[in-house]
Design a protein with these regions (language model features):
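Interhelical loop/hinge segments that connect adjacent transmembrane helices in multipass membrane
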Residues: 8-43, 221-224, 235-278
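Signature of the first transmembrane helix
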Residues: 38-98, 102, 266-291
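Residue-level recognition of transmembrane alpha-helices
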Residues: 44, 77-80, 124, 162-165, ...
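Helix-terminus/linker motif at the lipid-water interface of multi-pass membrane proteins
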Residues: 55-74, 143-152, 208-215, 276-309, ...
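Membrane-embedded alpha-helical segments of multi-pass transporters/permeases
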Residues: 59, 63, 89, 132-140, ...
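Small-residue-rich hydrophobic transmembrane alpha-helices
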Residues: 73-133, 172-191, 299-363
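Alpha-helical transmembrane segments of multi-pass membrane proteins
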Residues: 150-175, 374-386
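Membrane-interface helix-loop junctions in multi-pass transport and translocation proteins
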Residues: 189, 199-233, 365, 369, ...
Length: 386
C-alpha cells in the first residue's frame, strides 16, 4: 500500500474551522475526489511563496550588481537569457518527471514512484550536462558570435559570468531534478524550504562578495556557485535522507523503464521546446538591443528583474497545475483534471490582478533600489508602465 506520506500527505492543512459559507464556496469550486480545497490551498501558498522569494531575491541581486556599474548589469543581461535557454532544456525533463511522479502518486503505486523519481534524476542530469558543454568549452566564442557589437568591457565581464554560470548549471541539474520530484510528490513544504535555502544563501553570498569584498562580476559567480552547491546538498537530504518521502537505493536511481521514459519525454519535449523558443526570443532581443548601447541593456535588465517579481505569484499557479492535473490523470479522474486546469488559470488571473494593484504604486521605490542614473530610471519606468 502507498503510504500517505509518499505523496505529501503529512503537509496537508490542519482542519481549522472556517465560516460555513466560505467552506461551502471553496468545496464547490476547489474540492473533488482527488483533492479537498484545503489540500489545494496548502499546495498553492508554498508555491506562491516559492516563486515570489525566487524573483524577489533575483531582483535584490540585480540591485547589488548594479552598484558596480552599468557594464556589470549589461553583462549579466547578455548572459541570463542564454543560460536560461540551456536551463529550460533540462527543466523540461524535470517538469516531465514531475508529471509522471504525480501520476504515479495518483495510481498509488510506490514501485512506479521510485522508478519515475530515479529516471527523472539521472535523465535531467545527463541532458543538462550535454547541453551545457558548449558554454563550458567555448564561452568567449559563443558570446562573440551572438553579440559581436558588444563593448569590450561588457564582453569580458559577460565571459567571466557565463563561464561561472555554466559550471553552476552542472550542479543545478541535480537540484532541479530533486525539486521536480518533490513537487510531483506534493511536497510543497519541502520545495519551499529548498527555495528559501538556496535563495537566502545566494543573497548572503552576494552581499558578502559584491558589497563587502567588492569583487564585481566575479563575486556574483562565486555567490551563485556556493548557493547552488548548498541548495543541491539540501535537496538530496530532503529527498533521500531526512524523513525521506521516497525510499530508494543508489542502484535504483539508474533503473530504466521504457514506459516511464516515454511518458516523461511526451511531456518534456513539447514543454522544453516551448520554453526554449521563448528564451531564444529573449536572446534575439538582446542581440538587437546591443546596438542601442550599455545603458539600454542595463535598463532592460533592471525592468526585467522587477517584472519577474510582479508576475511570480501567477507563475506559481502554473507550477501548481503540474502537480494537481498530473495527480488527477494518475487517478484516472480526467474530468477533474480539466476542471482543476481551468481553476489554476483563474487563480493565476486573480493573482496577476492583485499583484498589479500592489506593485504599480511601489514601482518608484523598487526602482530606487538599483542606484540607477536618471536616464536609466526614466527608461525603466516607461518600460514597466507600458
Amino acid at each position: 500500500a502507498l503510504d500517505e506520506k509518499s505523496c505529501g500527505g503529512h503537509f496537508f492543512m490542519k482542519q481549522h474551522s472556517v465560516p460555513k459559507f466560505l467552506d461551502n464556496f471553496l468545496t464547490r469550486t476547489l474540492s473533488g475526489t482527488v483533492f479537498s480545497w484545503r489540500e489545494i490551498l496548502h499546495l498553492t501558498f508554498p508555491n506562491v511563496l516559492d516563486c515570489l522569494s525566487i524573483m524577489f531575491i533575483s531582483m535584490l541581486i540585480t540591485a547589488l550588481i548594479s552598484s558596480n556599474g552599468e557594464a556589470s548589469v549589461a553583462a549579466v543581461s547578455l548572459v541570463t537569457p542564454l543560460a536560461w535557454m540551456i536551463t529550460c532544456i533540462f527543466n523540461g525533463i524535470s517538469a516531465g518527471g514531475t508529471v509522471v511522479v504525480a501520476q504515479s502518486c495518483g495510481m498509488k503505486d510506490p514501485v512506479r514512484i521510485r522508478k519515475a523519481a530515479g529516471m527523472t534524476l539521472w535523465l535531467t542530469v545527463a541532458v543538462g550536462t550535454v547541453v551545457c558543454l558548449p558554454l563550458l568549452m567555448f564561452p568567449r566564442q559563443v558570446l562573440t558570435l551572438l553579440y559581436p557589437e558588444a563593448e569590450a568591457v561588457v564582453l569580458e565581464k559577460a565571459r567571466i559570468y557565463l563561464s561561472g554560470r555554466a559550471w553552476s548549471i552542472l550542479v543545478f541539474t541535480i537540484y532541479t531534478a530533486n525539486f521536480g520530484i518533490l513537487r510531483g510528490l506534493g511536497e510543497s513544504g519541502r520545495c519551499l524550504a529548498l527555495s528559501v535555502i538556496i535563495n537566502a544563501a545566494y543573497l548572503v553570498f552576494s552581499i558578502l562578495f559584491l558589497n563587502v569584498l567588492r569583487m564585481d562580476i566575479l563575486g556574483s559567480v562565486f555567490a551563485l556557485l556556493l548557493a547552488r552547491f548548498i541548495g543541491t546538498a539540501a535537496s538530496l537530504i530532503l529527498l533521500f535522507f531526512w524523513k525521506a518521502p521516497v525510499k530508494m537505493t543508489f542502484g535504483q536511481i539508474f533503473t530504466g523503464d521504457k514506459g516511464i521514459l516515454r511518458s516523461t519525454l511526451q511531456v518534456s519535449i513539447p514543454l522544453g521546446l516551448e520554453q526554449v523558443c521563448s528564451s531564444l526570443g529573449n536572446v534575439v532581443a538582446e542581440m538587437y538591443m546591443i546596438s542601442l548601447g550599455t545603458t539600454a541593456l542595463a535598463t532592460h535588465a533592471i525592468a526585467n528583474s522587477v517584472i519577474g517579481v510582479w508576475y511570480s505569484p501567477a507563475m506559481a499557479a502554473a507550477n501548481l497545475s503540474v502537480t494537481v492535473v498530473g495527480r488527477c490523470f494518475g487517478a484516472e479522474k480526467y474530468d477533474e483534471a480539466k476542471r482543476y486546469g481551468v481553476r489554476c488559470d483563474q487563480i493565476a488571473l486573480i493573482l496577476v490582478l492583485l499583484t498589479s494593484a500592489l506593485f504599480i504604486p511601489l514601482l518608484p521605490a523598487l526602482l530606487g533600489q538599483y542606484h540607477p542614473t536618471p536616464e536609466v530610471l526614466a527608461m525603466a519606468k516607461k518600460l514597466l508602465y507600458w
